């Protein structure tokens, strides 16, 4: 919950960046749909940036078209619009709630750097793990 995550992240970021934290801009990597993105990151980004004095980029990246799932022939990636001028010259802290391989974070790093930003770090609060299903073995 936000009540637990925001103080934990605030402490982590203050210990890591100290007095430089207010020079950073928080960029949450958008969810696959506008509705999910707003539900996941709008309140979170406001709370975290209020606690840390970072700038909040939430309103500067819009989900223009929701992602089409891969199993339906889509890319699984939403179409986004970036307020390009906003990112030029900024120092970015990327945030993804759950990371699997890091591809989204790498893609966003490259996109923001192409817009003139410098990505300082990326942070996540969870990692996807895949566990094998309980398999039945036949004894020989």
Q: Language-model segments: which ranges?
A:
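Active-site-facing substrate-recognition patch
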Residues: 1-24, 61-91, 101, 126-130
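Histidine/lysine/aspartate-rich catalytic loop segments that bind and position anionic ligands
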Residues: 48-68
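A phosphate-binding catalytic loop at a beta-strand-loop-alpha-helix junction
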Residues: 94-108
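Residues at the starts of beta-strands that form the adenosine-phosphate
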Residues: 55-57, 91, 118-121
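Loop/helix-junction capping segments adjacent to catalytic residues or to phosphate/diphosphate-binding pockets
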Residues: 34-38, 101-102
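Short, surface-exposed alpha-helical segments at coil->helix boundaries
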Residues: 38-42, 46
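PRPP-dependent phosphoribosyltransferase catalytic core
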Residues: 106-140
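Short glycine-rich phosphate-binding loop at a beta-alpha junction
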Residues: 21-33
């Amino acid at each position: 919950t936000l009540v637990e995550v925001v103080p934990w992240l605030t402490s982590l970021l203050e210990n890591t960046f100290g007095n430089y934290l207010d020079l950073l801009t928080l960029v949450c990597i958008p969810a696959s749909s506008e509705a999910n993105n707003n539900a996941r990151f709008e309140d979170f980004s406001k709370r975290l940036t209020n606690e840390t004095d970072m700038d909040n980029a939430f309103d500067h990246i819009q989900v223009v078209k929701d992602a089409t799932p891969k199993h339906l022939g889509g890319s699984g990636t939403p179409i986004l619009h970036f307020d390009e001028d906003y990112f030029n010259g900024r120092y970015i802290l990327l945030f993804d709630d759950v990371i699997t391989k890091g591809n989204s974070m790498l893609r966003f790093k490259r996109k923001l750097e192409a817009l003139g930003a410098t990505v300082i770090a990326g942070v996540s609060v969870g990692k996807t793990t895949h566990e094998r299903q309980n398999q039945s073995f036949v004894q020989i």
